[in-house]
């Protein structure tokens, strides 16, 4: 018997905005962290990120998100030893569960996930990385539960976040996720 989720019992609360449509066009700043802040993706050497095999696979999966979610554009991102920061742009709002013309839905294109929210994008990305890690390494749990997102509402915020992402390897030792 499975127990239905109950916030009072499970002590979890959503960190998402209650009435926000996470399919909406716009820019989103995403942070996804490794479980227990483990440094699984490589190391910072001379203020530059040196990716290991898993880190390179994370990079490949992140860059390939638009193949599975054609309404998404990948903007600036950085893979750090124990987390990823990235800007995702939704370039067109998805209407309903499928935004493809009827004649293309089941024939010419590979199957895509039905949900097109930021949450479904992150979920698919995390699942792909975890699956690869389990098959190709001794790592079983890659990610902490959930992810952090910030809706970028103006150019000033976008530019600050863009600069933060670019400087993240340089400022690694001051990062709140830094572990020695």
UniProtKB/Swiss-Prot annotation:
Protein name per the record: Uncharacterized protein HI_0554
SUPFAM superfamilies in UniProt: Transposase IS200-like
Any one GO biological process: DNA recombination
Cross-referenced PANTHER family: REP-ASSOCIATED TYROSINE TRANSPOSASE
Xref: InterPro entries: RAYT_transposase (IPR052715), Transposase_17 (IPR002686), Transposase_17_sf (IPR036515)
GO MF annotation: an example: transposase activity
TM spans (from-to): none
